[in-house]
Amino acid sequence: MNFFQAIFLGLVQALTEYLPVSSSAHVRIVGDLMLGGDPGAAFTAIIQIGTELAVLLYFRRDIWNILKSWCLCLAGKEGKDRASRFGAHNKDARLGWYIIIATIPILIAGVLFQHAIETTLRNLWITVAMLFIFGVILWIVDDRARQVKTLDDMNTKDAIWFGIGQMLALIPGVSRSGGTITFGRAMGYKREAAVRAAFLMAIPAVFGAGILEAVKAIKDVNADAMFPGWGATIAATVVAFVVGYIVIIGFLKFVSTYSYKAFAIYRIALAIIVAILLLCGVLSPLEGIPVSGNA
C-alpha cells in the first residue's frame, strides 16, 4: 500500500464510519479492489482513531459533562450511598455507567476471538452475508419500531443490548453504528437517540482497539505486509478525522428528518454487487488475509 492509497482508504473510512453501512466492510472491499488484498486489521483499527477523534470534538460538551458527573458521583460528591455513586440522581453519570456496561461485551469478545476477527471473519463472503442480513433487519426494525425513548430513559438492560449490538460489529459487514442503531431502534429509541448512543458508546471500544493495534504495529512493523508505514497511516488518520467531522454534522441532520431505509437499501445492493464480483473472480474472499492457522 502506498501513501495515496492509504489516504484514499482514510477517506473511505471517514465517509462510512458513522453511517450504518459498515466502514470495515468498505475498507476491506475497496482495499481488495485497489490493492488486491485486505488492508489489514491493524491499519483499519488505527485509522478509526481519526474518526473517533472527530466524535470527541463534536460531542466534547456531552463527553465532558458525562466524565465530570461520573467522577463526582463515584467520589461521593452527589451522596455517599451506593445509589448516588452509581448516578441515581444524575443522568449524565448514569449514562457514563451505561457506556461502560455497553463496552464490556465488545471487550470480552474482542479478547476471546481476536484471532478469528483478524483472519476468518474477514472473509468477504461473511462480509456480504452481514451486509445483506443486517440491511434487511435495519429496514424492518426502523420501519416498525416505536419512537418513544431518549437517552434519559436508558437502563442497565438497554445498555447491555446496545453493547451486544456493538459487539456484533466485530464482524465486518455488520457496522458498529448499524448494530447499535438497530438494537436501539428495536428497543424503541428515537432515531436521534440511537445515533447518539452509537457515537458515544463506540469511543472506548474504538480507541482501545486502535491503541492496541498501534502498539502491535510498533512492536513488529514488518508483520503486516499491507501496512503502509506510519507516515501514510497517520496522514490517512488525519483525513479520516477532518472528513469524519463533516459527515457527523450531515448524518445527524439527515436522521432528524429521514428514516434509515436508504442505508438499508444501499447495504443490500452493495452485498449483491460484491457477491457478483466474488462469483466472477474480480474479488477474492481471502486475498491478503493471514492464514487462520498461524495463531
UniProtKB/Swiss-Prot annotation:
Superkingdom in the source lineage? Bacteria
Biological processes, Gene Ontology terms? cell wall organization; peptidoglycan biosynthetic process; regulation of cell shape; response to antibiotic
* Chemical reaction(s) catalysed: di-trans,octa-cis-undecaprenyl diphosphate + H2O = di-trans,octa-cis-undecaprenyl phosphate + phosphate + H(+)
Summarizing the function annotation, the protein's role is: Catalyzes the dephosphorylation of undecaprenyl diphosphate (UPP). Confers resistance to bacitracin.
Is the keyword Cell wall biogenesis/degradation assigned to this protein? yes
Its record classes its membrane topology as: Multi-pass membrane protein
Source gene?
uppP
Give yes or no: UniProt keyword Cell membrane: yes
Q: What is this enzyme's EC? A: 3.6.1.27
Q: What is this protein called?
A: Undecaprenyl-diphosphatase
What lineage does UniProt assign to this protein's organism? Bacteria, Bacillati, Actinomycetota, Actinomycetes, Bifidobacteriales
List where in the cell it is found. Answer: Cell membrane
Name the family the entry cites.
Belongs to the UppP family.
List the GO terms this entry assigns under cellular component, sorted alphabetically.
plasma membrane
Q: What is its main location?
A: membrane
InterPro entries for the chain: UppP
What more is known? Bacitracin is thought to be involved in the inhibition of peptidoglycan synthesis by sequestering undecaprenyl diphosphate, thereby reducing the pool of lipid carrier available.
Q: Which NCBIfam families match?
A: PRK00281.2-1, undec_PP_bacA
Q: Which HAMAP family match?
A: Undec_diphosphatase
Which sequence ranges are marked TM in the entry?
A: 39-59, 97-117, 121-141, 198-218, 232-252, 263-283
For molecular function, the Gene Ontology terms on record are: undecaprenyl-diphosphatase activity
- Keyword tags: Antibiotic resistance, Cell membrane, Cell shape, Cell wall biogenesis/degradation, Hydrolase, Membrane, Peptidoglycan synthesis, Transmembrane, Transmembrane helix
